[in-house]
């Protein structure tokens, strides 16, 4: 391979080629090379004398004739023709370009920069003065010279692949020199052309010596003015924001003031209304439609004040005795205090006070009654008898009874409260079960059995089980004892109240059973104990009338042979008619009780089937209410789609209650339908209470 590569050096025409090369070089601009490169170029390569002629010389000679030198390639790349160059011969020295490359590789400069310098030296004429690249290429702001457009290629790095033509360098140089020679008028015109004002241009030219300095001066001054304007704007904004905040605060304070005033006004109106209602309740408003005994209730049932009662003088020999009127007043005060704190302990108080106002229109603090006409109650403590034989509190013996466990006491109270709630809703059978469960937890003769027996006896009276009612009353009286509960209390309530209430109930039940003599004895005992009221007097008169009519009837039977023209025949006939009416009423009541007891279980099954699984779902109960009601009730069926809104549910509930309310049923309603209505009313009432809690009504 070495022989093949050295084909050009062993040719016989080598000296002539060297001469041609030297002649060609003489035409081009000369340039000096570094010393190492020149020495390498002048070095003689030894020839091999005994080298035979190469048979492939002509072949390679043709290829070398077609080669293009590196300099020509560079000229073609730049695209500028060389006017000084002449056509060179086909024979040239190949080491010329190699030496240039070797020189460039040994220099520390950048390769592109060296090539660029060589190209510029070849382009520049010999007579032209040497100008460095940094002097030729000076970037100016061409936007400042709009009237002299210059097509200058954009380049950042000198020596890049795109070289700068020689003509463009001359234009840049001429432009720079023209800028340096601009007059003040021309600079003024250029500043005006750039958009600056007259004052700005003149002031900038006075404080600067060139166009660039003038532009910088104007820009700096504008920046300073902008900062000053920003400061003024910030101060103005801060002042305006402070005023805005003050106005907002003032508006907010006015709004709060108006709201507080409105709320205070509303509260004042509410308080004034409540005060007016309280005063009206306290004030005894007289109604001209009421009879005299209702308005002057103090003549019949009010307490006697110490000023009205005659005072008994105190004997000197017994100074330790207390006057009778003071003793009565003290007992009355303590009794009223005990009653005021325990209105919720007994269920009977709630019912009697409510029904008494509706039937007799007595004041609520005068006496207590019941919801049923046949069912009356005693006047609690409003007209107590002044009894000197009544044992004082100091003489009452303390009861010795078993102490209950805390768990048992809690269970009994819970069951009692549940039974009271069921009674208020009208579910008497379930209330009886709860009271019975509570009584089973307590020992016999325990004082806590008294309120439970009292409530259960009332439930039995409601359902018509009069015999069981009498049994509970007798057990209660046996627990209270012969002292009749004077000086004793249960849960801060006088035990005598329970005694009197249940004795009144016993007298009513005996009167219903046509045991008028026993009922009369109870009424007389209550009156003898100081229970002087219209309620007890009426009971006594009824029993006396029934007894007298019964005796007169028997007497008339014995004297049937007497002439009809006797003067007392009319009175006897009237009394006998009254007695017949009373007996017929008693027979109807007994038949009604028997029928109620007979139909209770079948009706309960029907009601349980209706309410099963939906006791607390008022919508489902109303939607299926038609399954248990009778046609004469005139109930229109309601679907669940009509009971979506709580308002619609309330309307349907009010209609259902008006249909099944026990007091609003027609007189010809059968016993079975009455029982169904009572049970449905109780269940709907319970579901309505739950519905109100769930929907916040």
From Swiss-Prot:
Signal sequence bounds: none
Report each TPR repeat as a residue range.
412-445
Record keyword Chaperone present: yes
Keyword Chaperone included in the entry's annotation: yes
Database matches in Pfam families: UBA
Any one Gene Ontology BP term: clathrin coat disassembly
- Segments carrying the region annotation (Disordered) are 1-94, 306-346, 547-573
- Compositionally biased residues, Low complexity: 13-32
**Cellular component per GO, a single term:** intracellular membrane-bounded organelle
Q: Which residues form the UBA domain?
A: 181-221
- Basic and acidic residues bias located where? 62-77, 323-333
What's an example of a GO molecular-function annotation for this chain? Hsp70 protein binding
Q: Compositional bias (Polar residues) spans?
A: 81-92, 334-345, 559-573
User: Residues in domain J?
Assistant: 633-696
Q: Which keywords belong to this entry?
A: Chaperone, TPR repeat
Under PANTHER family, the record lists: AUXILIN/CYCLIN G-ASSOCIATED KINASE-RELATED, J DOMAIN-CONTAINING PROTEIN
- Its protein name is UBA domain-containing protein 7
From what organism does this protein derive?
A: Schizosaccharomyces pombe (strain 972 / ATCC 24843)
């Amino acid at each position: 391979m070495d022989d093949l590569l050295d084909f050009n050096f062993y040719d016989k025409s080598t000296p002539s080629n060297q001469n041609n090369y030297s002649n060609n070089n003489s035409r081009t601009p000369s340039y000096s090379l570094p010393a190492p490169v020149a020495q390498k170029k002048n070095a003689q390569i030894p020839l091999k004398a005994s080298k035979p002629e190469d048979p492939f010389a002509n072949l390679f000679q043709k290829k070398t004739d077609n080669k293009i030198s590196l300099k020509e390639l560079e000229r073609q790349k730049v695209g500028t023709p060389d006017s000084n160059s002449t056509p060179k011969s086909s024979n040239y020295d190949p080491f010329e370009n190699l030496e240039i490359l070797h020189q460039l590789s040994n220099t520390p400069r950048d390769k592109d920069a060296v090539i660029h310098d060589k190209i510029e030296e070849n382009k520049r004429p010999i007579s032209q003065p040497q100008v460095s690249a940094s002097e030729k290429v000076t970037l100016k702001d061409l936007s400042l010279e709009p009237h002299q457009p210059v097509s200058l290629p954009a380049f950042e790095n000198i020596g890049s692949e795109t070289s700068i033509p020689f003509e463009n360098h001359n234009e840049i140089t001429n432009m720079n020199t023209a800028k340096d020679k601009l007059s003040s008028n021309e600079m003024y015109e250029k500043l005006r052309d750039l958009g600056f004002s007259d004052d700005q241009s003149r002031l900038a030219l006075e404080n600067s010596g060139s166009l660039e300095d003038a532009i910088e001066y104007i820009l700096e001054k504008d920046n300073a003015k902008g900062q000053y304007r920003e400061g003024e704007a910030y101060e103005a904004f801060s002042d305006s924001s402070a005023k805005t905040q003050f106005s907002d605060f003032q508006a907010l304070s006015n709004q709060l003031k108006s709201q507080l005033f409105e709320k205070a006004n509303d509260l004042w109106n509410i308080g004034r209304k409540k005060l007016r209602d309280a005063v009206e309740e306290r004030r005894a408003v007289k109604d001209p439609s009421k009879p005299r005994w209702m308005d002057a209730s103090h003549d019949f049932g009010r307490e006697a004040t110490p000023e009205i009662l005659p005072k008994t003088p105190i004997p000197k020999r017994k100074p330790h005795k207390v006057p009778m009127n003071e003793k009565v007043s003290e007992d009355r005060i303590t009794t009223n205090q005990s009653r005021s704190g325990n209105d919720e302990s007994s269920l009977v108080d709630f019912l009697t006070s409510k029904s008494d106002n509706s039937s007799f229109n007595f004041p609520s603090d005068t006496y207590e009654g019941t919801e049923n006409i046949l069912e009356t109650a005693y006047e609690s403590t409003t007209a107590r008898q002044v009894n000197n034989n009544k044992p004082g509190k100091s003489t009452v013996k303390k009861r010795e009874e078993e102490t209950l466990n805390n768990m048992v006491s809690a269970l009994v109270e819970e069951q009692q409260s549940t039974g009271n709630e069921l009674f208020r809703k009208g579910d008497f059978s379930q209330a009886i079960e709860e009271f019975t469960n509570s009584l089973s937890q307590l020992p016999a003769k325990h004082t806590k059995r008294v309120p439970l027996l009292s409530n259960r006896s009332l439930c039995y009276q409601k359902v018509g089980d009069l015999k069981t009612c009498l049994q509970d009353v007798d057990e209660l009286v046996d627990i209270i004892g012969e002292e009749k509960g004077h000086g004793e209390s249960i849960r801060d309530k006088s035990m005598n109240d329970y005694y009197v209430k249940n004795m009144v109930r016993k007298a009513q039940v005996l009167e219903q059973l046509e045991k008028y003599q026993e009922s009369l004895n109870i009424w007389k005992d209550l009156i003898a104990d100081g229970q002087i009221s219209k309620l007890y007097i009426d009971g006594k008169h009824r029993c006396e009338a029934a007894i007298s009519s019964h005796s007169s009837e028997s007497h008339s039977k014995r004297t049937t042979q007497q002439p009809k023209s006797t003067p007392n025949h009319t009175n006897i006939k009237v009394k006998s008619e009254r007695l017949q009416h009373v007996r017929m009423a008693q027979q109807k009541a007994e038949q009604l009780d028997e029928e109620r007891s007979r139909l209770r279980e079948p009706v309960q099954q029907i009601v349980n089937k209706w309410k099963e699984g939906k006791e607390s779902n008022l919508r489902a109960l109303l939607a299926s209410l038609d399954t248990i009601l009778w046609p004469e009730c005139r109930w229109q069926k309601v679907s669940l789609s009509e009971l979506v809104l709580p308002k619609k549910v309330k309307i349907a509930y009010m209609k259902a209650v008006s249909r099944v309310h026990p007091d609003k049923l027609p007189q010809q309603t059968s016993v079975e339908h009455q029982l169904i209505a009572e049970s449905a009313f109780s269940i709907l009432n319970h579901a309505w209470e739950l519905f109100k809690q769930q929907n916040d009504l």
